[in-house]
Design a protein with these regions (language model features):
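Conserved alpha-helical substructure of the radical SAM core
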Residues: 2-99
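Glycine-centered loop/turn positions within well-structured domains
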Residues: 7, 74, 109-110, 139
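Conserved sequence/active-site signature of Rossmann-fold short-chain dehydrogenase/reductase
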Residues: 17, 107, 144
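Residue-level signal for the nucleotide or nucleotide-sugar donor/cofactor binding architecture
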Residues: 25, 58, 120, 148-151
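Conserved C-terminal portion of the radical SAM core fold
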Residues: 40-49, 70-77, 98-101, 123-170
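Short secondary-structure transition/capping segments
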Residues: 87-90, 112-115, 152-155
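Short, hinge-like loop/turn segments at secondary-structure boundaries
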Residues: 91-95, 118-120, 158-160
Length: 170
C-alpha cells in the first residue's frame, strides 16, 4: 500500500521511507485493484494491506470499507507507531477488517524495540494486540528470528500461546 513508515527496523525489506511515494496507487487505483481481487472468487482471497505502514495512508478506512463492500476479506499489517490506536482499530473493525498482523520480535521492550529501532514500539504492539482481542479481530504474530532474539523464543512463546485468536509465524 505504501513504502512510508516511521520505524527503523534492522531487517526491513520494504525499503521504507518516511513519507509516501508519489507513485503509490491513488484511492481510485486501489479500489480498482480491490475490484480485480473480488473477481478472483468466490470466495475472493484475503487481501493483506501492508507496507511500509498502511496507517500512513489517509484512505485506509475507506479502502477497508470498499473491500468489505465487495466481499473481499481484509487484513492489515501496521507498524506500531502512535498512528495505531485503539480507536483506529475499532474504526477499521467497523469498516470490515477481519485480521491484524503484528510483529513481535522480543518478549520485552529491550529486545523488541532494539529490533525495531524506536523506543516504545513493544508497548504499542501489545496495546494493539489487546485492542484486537477486545474487538475479536484475528491476529497473526510475525517474528523475524535472528541472532538478536533467537535466545528469546521460549519467552515469546509464553506471550503468544495463551491466545486462541492468534497465529504465530516465525
Amino acid at each position: 500500500m505504501t513504502r512510508a513508515c516511521d520505524l527503523a527496523c534492522a531487517h526491513c525489506r520494504a525499503e521504507a521511507i518516511p513519507t509516501r511515494d508519489p507513485l503509490e496507487l491513488s484511492t481510485l487505483e486501489a479500489q480498482a485493484l480491490i475490484d480485480e481481487v473480488a473477481w478472483l472468487g468466490p470466495p475472493p482471497p484475503l487481501l493483506v494491506m501492508t507496507g511500509g505502514d498502511p496507517m500512513k495512508r489517509p484512505d485506509l478506512t475507506e479502502l477497508v470499507a470498499y473491500a468489505a463492500g465487495r466481499h473481499v476479506p481484509v487484513a492489515f499489517s501496521p507498524s506500531a507507531t502512535p498512528l495505531l490506536t485503539r480507536g483506529v482499530i475499532a474504526e477499521l473493525k467497523a469498516a470490515g477488517l477481519k485480521a491484524l498482523s503484528l510483529s513481535v520480535d522480543g518478549s520485552c521492550p529491550q529486545i523488541h524495540d532494539a529490533f525495531r529501532g524506536i523506543p516504545g514500539v513493544f508497548e504499542r504492539t501489545m496495546a494493539a494486540w489487546e485492542a484486537a482481542r477486545e474487538f475479536e479481530i484475528k491476529v497473526q504474530i510475525n517474528t523475524t528470528v535472528s541472532r538478536l532474539n533467537l535466545f528469546d523464543l521460549p519467552r515469546m512463546a509464553h506471550i503468544v500461546r495463551p491466545s486462541p485468536w492468534v497465529t504465530w509465524n516465525t
